[in-house]
């Protein structure tokens, strides 16, 4: 019989919880009950109610609806939230309306369902003779809370936290080395079975450092580098770029000198062979033939060996100088047949048949 009743009631309970969650989370409305002392309702952070001037009414139990006692405004000058007192008894009903009176948000449940406890305070850390650490703090004024203690070595990363949890406000963390330094932090978490799924844990306390047997200076031996001391990236990049450019220029000049030293200078053929490219378009055979045709004829070896005779000067006996020039064979006197030869003063004349003398 009990199983049948559970099967019938379970879907209804789940549907009611889903409906309540849907009403509570509808739009951009957030409800938080801070340490069961005040209830904070905020809206307008999203697109549904951004810029809208909304009004809130509330009541506990079946009393009359009351207006919000204290609004806070956004930067645009419109309402964005309300602070109202929390009561541990009775159901809290919230009604949020727009300027025309239309309902935009409504919820009715205990204020503790939106509980967010305050962080633990006056946290004390003590080493035990066994090498463990006892963490203690004052208890909250209400029940239904679990506490979490996280620890890590001082130089570990953010994700290196190890958790120890329990229902009391006095927890012992074991497995530690007294010669090392550790960081601790604590928070309180409402139990879902006691307050519901919309309750949320408190903020973490500030990190407390425990040095143990080590000196306090050893805990801060290797602090994280300050961002202000980091070298500026832009000047460093510009300096590296300038250095790289200068190195490339020097390498190019040195490479050119090495190339000039290793490779001989090749003369320009257009200066040594005029007309080779202008007239013959690089045809060396045609250029040679043209150069031979325009060159003066060279002397043969026979002409170089030929000796030309020179005329001699003949000194006659009477002291007069006579220049004897050889005559060509066509001008040598030939005596015609039948002529008489006459010699006068050493000169010979030939007398022809007509009586004239021929010298």
Curated annotation (Swiss-Prot):
Keyword entries, A-Z: Cell membrane, Disulfide bond, Glycoprotein, Membrane, Receptor, Secreted, Signal, Transmembrane, Transmembrane helix
Ranges in coiled-coil conformation: none
Positions occupied by motif WSXWS motif: 201-205
Residues on the membrane's Extracellular side span 20-232
- Keyword Transmembrane present in the record's keywords: the answer is yes
Q: Where is the signal peptide?
A: 1-19
Q: In which tissues is it expressed?
A: High level of expression in liver, lung and testis. Also expressed in heart, brain, spleen, thymus and bone marrow. Highly expressed in progenitors and myeloid cells. Isoform 2 is expressed in primary hemotopoietic cells.
Is Glycoprotein one of the keywords?
yes
UniProt region (Disordered), positions on chain: 312-336
Where does the UniProt entry place glycosylation sites? Answer: 53, 122
Disulfide-bonded cysteine pairs: these are 68-82, 168-169, 181-219
List GO BP terms, alphabetically. inflammatory response
Q: Where are the transmembrane segments?
A: 233-253
Can you list the GO cellular component terms from the UniProt entry?
Answer: external side of plasma membrane; extracellular region
Q: Which CDD domains match?
A: FN3
Give the Cytoplasmic membrane side ranges: 254-359
Family that this chain belongs to: Belongs to the type I cytokine receptor family. Type 5 subfamily.
Q: Which PANTHER family match?
A: CYTOKINE RECEPTOR, FIBRONECTIN TYPE-III DOMAIN-CONTAINING PROTEIN
Q: What is known of its domains?
A: The WSXWS motif appears to be necessary for proper protein folding and thereby efficient intracellular transport and cell-surface receptor binding. The box 1 motif is required for JAK interaction and/or activation.
What is the name of the protein in this document?
Answer: Cytokine receptor-like factor 2
Natural source organism: Mus musculus
Record lineage: Eukaryota, Metazoa, Chordata, Craniata, Vertebrata
């Amino acid at each position: 019989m009990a199983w049948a009743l559970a099967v019938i009631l379970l879907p209804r309970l789940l549907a009611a919880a889903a409906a309540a969650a849907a009403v509570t989370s509808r739009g951009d409305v957030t409800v938080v009950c801070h340490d069961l002392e005040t209830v904070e309702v905020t809206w307008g952070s999203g697109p549904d109610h951004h810029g809208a001037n909304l009004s809130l009414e509330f009541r506990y139990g079946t009393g009359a609806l009351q207006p919000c006692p204290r609004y806070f405004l956004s930067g645009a000058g419109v309402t964005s939230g309300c602070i109202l007192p929390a009561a541990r008894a009775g159901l809290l009903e919230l009604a949020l309306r727009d300027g025309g009176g239309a309902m935009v948000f409504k919820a009715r449940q205990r204020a503790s369902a939106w509980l967010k406890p305050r962080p633990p305070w006056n946290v004390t850390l003590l080493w035990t003779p066994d090498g463990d650490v006892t963490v203690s703090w004052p208890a909250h004024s209400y029940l239904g809370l679990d506490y979490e203690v996280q620890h890590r070595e001082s130089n570990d990363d953010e994700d290196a936290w190890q958790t120890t949890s329990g229902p009391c406000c006095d927890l012992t963390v074991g497995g530690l080395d007294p010669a090392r330094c550790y960081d601790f932090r604590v928070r309180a978490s409402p139990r879902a079975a006691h307050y519901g799924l919309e309750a949320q844990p408190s903020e973490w306390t500030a990190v407390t450092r425990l040095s143990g047997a080590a000196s306090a200076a050893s805990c801060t031996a290797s602090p994280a580098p300050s961002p202000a001391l980091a070298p500026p990236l832009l000047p460093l990049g510009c300096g590296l770029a300038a250095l790289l450019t200068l190195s490339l220029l020097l390498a190019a000049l040195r490479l050119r000198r090495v190339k000039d030293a290793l490779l001989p200078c090749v003369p320009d053929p257009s200066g040594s062979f005029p007309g080779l490219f202008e007239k013959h378009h690089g045809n060396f055979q045609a250029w040679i033939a043209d150069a031979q045709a325009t060159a003066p004829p060279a002397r043969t070896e026979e002409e170089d060996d030929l000796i030309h005779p020179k005329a001699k000067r003949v000194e006659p006996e009477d002291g007069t100088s006579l220049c004897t020039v050889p005559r060509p064979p066509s001008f040598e006197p030939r005596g015609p047949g039948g002529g008489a030869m006459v010699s006068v003063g050493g000169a010979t004349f030939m007398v022809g048949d007509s009586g004239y003398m021929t010298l």
